[in-house]
Amino acid sequence: RHEVPQANLECDEGAMDLKISTGNMVALYQILSASKDSDCPAGGAVTWTDQVVAGLRICMGCPVELDLESEELKVPVAVSISKRRPPGWSPLRAAVTSFNEKEFSPPAPPSRAEYSLYFDMRK
């Protein structure tokens, strides 16, 4: 394994800012080894040295717990119920039903707004 030398970048480099703002230049940056995170104040001399540690991420398609009181879910749930309603279904009967279990849904890819809802409704 080859170690890449650590590059400490100043948060605010005045000479670079001047060149970019006055000479219509384009700045090109290359990430050599890893992402960095910093709490550099504007105009400060603190260097970017803190390693960004990736946390556990939810995979696309893995079930996630939903908030049953969420305003965001009212329309998808109503559409899902209306498409799968049993014979003899009426809006009045649907209004008095409630969810009995916490629901799970795979998170939708960013390019689509789609839910797979599984619910248990009882009077």
From Swiss-Prot:
Domain of life of the source: Eukaryota
GO biological process, one term: vasodilation
Posttranslational modification: Bradykinin is released from kininogen by kallikrein.
GO molecular function, one term: cysteine-type endopeptidase inhibitor activity
Record keywords: Cleavage on pair of basic residues, Glycoprotein, Protease inhibitor, Thiol protease inhibitor, Vasoactive, Vasodilator
Signal peptide boundaries: none
Transmembrane segments: none
Function, as annotated: Inhibits papain and ficin (cysteine proteinases) but not trypsin (a serine proteinase).
Name of the protein: Kininogen
Organism: Gadus morhua
